[in-house]
């Protein structure tokens, strides 16, 4: 399946919640009818079956992190192999992706923009260029903007936007240096309460 390139707000309307696919300059409910699905019959809200609810939750999380279906399934398999709670393991793996860490540190306004920065070799990890968005960042890794990319206006603008967002406690960022440290693995309480990972586990456990 190809990566979705259509209107980002349509995806948020489909899931009925802000997926943080836009820059966050304005609240998403001022841009669109978030409670109404796209399409002619979007105002109708059919009652979902258990399977439907599980599928919608999986799609929502997959779209938040910009993951393709096959990738997402592989993350679930890895989460299931690890010790502990499978659902929480899944979220931790997704949060540890380099493109997500770049976004969380404020170097990009969206995860899609962060993915582009990584792919274009604008990001270094422990002093080495890494251009793989799915690269797993480890505790104490230093993630920074490459020296020759620090003049990019969009990175500076993103750092200004990041000042308006809640700062992740598991990261330590020096905005002036455009670098940060992955201090610890995030706990479930650190992450969005709007995600019900248990539904995803139920879906894949069938």
From Swiss-Prot:
Family membership: Belongs to the universal ribosomal protein uS4 family.
Superkingdom: Bacteria
PROSITE patterns: RIBOSOMAL_S4, S4
Tagged with keyword Transferase: no
Cellular component, GO, one term: small ribosomal subunit
CDD domains referenced in this protein's UniProt entry, alphabetically: S4 (cd00165)
Function as written in the Swiss-Prot or TrEMBL entry: One of the primary rRNA binding proteins, it binds directly to 16S rRNA where it nucleates assembly of the body of the 30S subunit. With S5 and S12 plays an important role in translational accuracy.
Top-level taxonomy: Bacteria, Pseudomonadati, Pseudomonadota, Gammaproteobacteria, Pasteurellales
Pfam family name, one: Ribosomal_S4
GO molecular function: rRNA binding; structural constituent of ribosome
SUPFAM superfamilies registered for this protein in UniProt: Alpha-L RNA-binding motif (SSF55174)
Protein name, entry field: Small ribosomal subunit protein uS4
PANTHER family linked: 30S 40S RIBOSOMAL PROTEIN (PTHR11831), SMALL RIBOSOMAL SUBUNIT PROTEIN US4M (PTHR11831:SF4)
Alphabetical UniProt keywords: Ribonucleoprotein, Ribosomal protein, RNA-binding, rRNA-binding
Complex and partners: Part of the 30S ribosomal subunit. Contacts protein S5. The interaction surface between S4 and S5 is involved in control of translational fidelity.
S4 RNA-binding domain: residues covered: 96-156
Biological source species: Histophilus somni (strain 2336)
InterPro entries, per database record: Ribosomal_uS4, Ribosomal_uS4_bac-type, Ribosomal_uS4_CS, Ribosomal_uS4_N, S4_RNA-bd, S4_RNA-bd_sf
């Amino acid at each position: 399946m190809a990566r979705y390139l259509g209107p980002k707000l349509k995806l948020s309307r489909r899931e009925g919640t802000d997926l943080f696919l836009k820059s966050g300059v304005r609240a998403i409910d001022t841009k669109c009818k978030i409670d109404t699905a796209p399409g002619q019959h979007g105002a109708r809200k059919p009652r979902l079956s258990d399977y439907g609810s599980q599928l919608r939750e999986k799609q929502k999380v997959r779209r938040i992190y910009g993951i393709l279906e096959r990738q997402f399934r592989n993350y679930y398999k890895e989460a299931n192999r690890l010790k502990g709670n499978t659902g929480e393991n899944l979220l931790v793996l997704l949060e540890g992706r380099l493109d997500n860490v770049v976004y969380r540190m404020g170097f990009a306004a969206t995860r899609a923009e962060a993915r582009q920065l990584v792919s274009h070799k604008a990001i270094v990890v422990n002093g080495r260029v890494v251009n793989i968005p799915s690269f797993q960042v480890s505790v104490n890794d230093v993630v920074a903007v490459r020296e020759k990319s620090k003049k990019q206006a969009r990175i500076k603008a993103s750092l200004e936007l990041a000042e308006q967002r809640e700062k992740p406690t598991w990261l330590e960022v020096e905005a002036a240096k455009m670098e940060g440290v992955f201090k610890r693995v995030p706990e479930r309480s650190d992450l969005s309460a709007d995600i019900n990972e248990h539904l995803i586990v139920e879906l894949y456990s069938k």
